């Protein structure tokens, strides 16, 4: 099996969260933007609309966010576990299992305000968190 086919097969096994992280790392590593249009459509998209020469096309604003717990420092586990338990509304014995493999989405499809609040609580406890 060729290297390309092996990579494709491995990509098929990724979760959405892992795929999102992969895209982010590819963008950072190679200095590209995965949301940028490719091909002949670039010329058309770059032309201003007839009604307003200065009007730029507005990007659709994201309304739902995921709070991703990326890292828990060993010396701050207890405090972070308490916050994770409260945010995820899970039992004490489930917290360690939940945080066993990171990064992991702690909250999914929540408002920006809720995501920011959860991120702040986790960061205050010492966790490394990002909102996607």
From Swiss-Prot:
Gene3D superfamilies on file: 3.30.1390.10, Single helix bin
Major site of localization recorded for this protein: plastid
GO biological process: translation
Top-rank lineage group of the source organism: Eukaryota
SUPFAM superfamilies assigned to the protein according to its UniProt record, in alphabetical order: ClpS-like, Ribosomal protein L7/12, oligomerisation (N-terminal) domain
GO cellular component: chloroplast; ribonucleoprotein complex; ribosome
GO MF annotation terms: mRNA binding; structural constituent of ribosome
Pfam family membership, one: Ribosomal_L12
InterPro entries: Ribosomal_bL12, Ribosomal_bL12_C, Ribosomal_bL12_C/ClpS-like, Ribosomal_bL12_oligo, Ribosomal_bL12_oligo_N_sf
Swiss-Prot/TrEMBL keywords: Chloroplast, Plastid, Ribonucleoprotein, Ribosomal protein
Family: Belongs to the bacterial ribosomal protein bL12 family.
Subunit structure: Homodimer. Part of the ribosomal stalk of the 50S ribosomal subunit. Forms a multimeric L10(L12)X complex, where L10 forms an elongated spine to which 2 to 4 L12 dimers bind in a sequential fashion. Binds GTP-bound translation factors.
Function noted in UniProt: Forms part of the ribosomal stalk which helps the ribosome interact with GTP-bound translation factors. Is thus essential for accurate translation.
UniProt-listed PANTHER family: 39S RIBOSOMAL PROTEIN L12, LARGE RIBOSOMAL SUBUNIT PROTEIN BL12M
HAMAP family given in the database record: Ribosomal_bL12 (MF_00368)
Annotated protein name in UniProt: Large ribosomal subunit protein bL12c
Organism of derivation: Tetradesmus obliquus (Green alga)
